């Protein structure tokens, strides 16, 4: 390129007001400079009553566990490398069920003490819905959420919540 410096940035944006609540900037390259590391530096901004609506890049066991530890809830698109099987788990409705994720091995960046405080399993809700737009291919979207109460948070409400992140 032209030699201009480049950086990574992660922002927490309020869904209600579209205001940037907080942001983290970091170098483009180097250890602990990825977007997940930047988001980890902002986790203290989440608390009771907050719902983190996130891209699939952040939909990991460790990130969800960290947000739950701060009493925040999660609504995120499932990472494309995770397999979904709606025949397993506890069925709540068509393409709506509870699943259990097991804690993965300790990442290099995490110390042993922190790792041992993380729960061995997470009970999550997985839903799938379809986006139909005239003149376009129908697209399936799979969401992972910690909003487990299917009577309080129906499937369509979760799909709508995730869809709002694009507005």
Feature locations, PLM:
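Single, function-defining residue in the core of a domain
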Residues: 2-167
């Amino acid at each position: 390129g032209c030699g201009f410096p480049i950086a990574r940035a992660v922002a927490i944006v309020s869904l209600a007001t579209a205001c940037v609540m907080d942001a983290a900037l970091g170098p483009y390259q180097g250890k602990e400079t990825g977007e997940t590391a930047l988001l980890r530096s902002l986790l203290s901004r989440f608390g009771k009553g907050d719902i983190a609506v996130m891209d699939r890049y952040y939909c990991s066991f460790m990130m969800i566990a960290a947000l739950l530890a701060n009493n925040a809830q999660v609504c995120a698109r499932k990472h494309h490398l995770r397999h979904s099987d709606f025949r397993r788990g506890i069925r709540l409705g068509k393409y709506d069920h509870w699943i259990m994720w097991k804690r993965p091995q300790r990442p290099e960046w995490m110390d042993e003490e922190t790792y041992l405080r993380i729960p061995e399993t997470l009970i999550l809700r997985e839903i799938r819905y379809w986006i139909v737009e005239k003149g376009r291919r129908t697209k399936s979207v799979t969401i992972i959420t910690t909003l487990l109460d299917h009577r309080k948070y129906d499937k369509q409400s979760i799909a709508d919540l995730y869809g709002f992140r694009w507005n």
